């Protein structure tokens, strides 16, 4: 067992190396791409749906609900990115149950790459939702004096995302390796199950933090509140019309 998949070298020529991080990441991407294509190949748009499709829809609805609870009003817009992020990290961590497999999330290069994806996605969604000018103005809040700190915060939280995931996965691997040396029979099984649990939790935390960062970049309290009030008024009018009652709406 290696502390990091970077230590596992499959092929080397000069300064070019194919280590475990690269190989396992490619295999995971291939597996997820083929698996997604296979799973969604026979989905139906009609009323008759298989149990498998019902299960998939429940999972998607649950993820969308989780995204909307964080503060994103249109979860379908962000589901492809956030869902892919969660699935990749979760599968990468949970596959540690297979012998000979080294999770690529145990490498700092992988976690940094994932954090950079979030770093790029935050301003992308923020600018698309609010426009370039309004998004840039958010860095001047609450006072323009905090502009350098707001910019620095973008980089520090990206670094924190990468280091948090890397540290938790690497520490779990180290503890499991130590326990295999000290007690090579019973205790490593317990630690292996705990390591899988930690891997799933870390995937959830990573994706939730990414959701929070995107929600903060796309939020506009005043505009959202106004939209919510308008929607509430329309719903109330519709309810009154359906009930045949006359309602008086206060401004």
Swiss-Prot record:
SUPFAM superfamilies: F1F0 ATP synthase subunit A. GO terms for molecular function: proton-transporting ATP synthase activity, rotational mechanism. It comes from the Bacteria. GO terms for biological process: proton motive force-driven plasma membrane ATP synthesis. Residues 224-251 are annotated as: Disordered. Key component of the proton channel; it plays a direct role in the translocation of protons across the membrane. This is ATP synthase subunit a. It comes from Nitrosospira multiformis (strain ATCC 25196 / NCIMB 11849 / C 71).
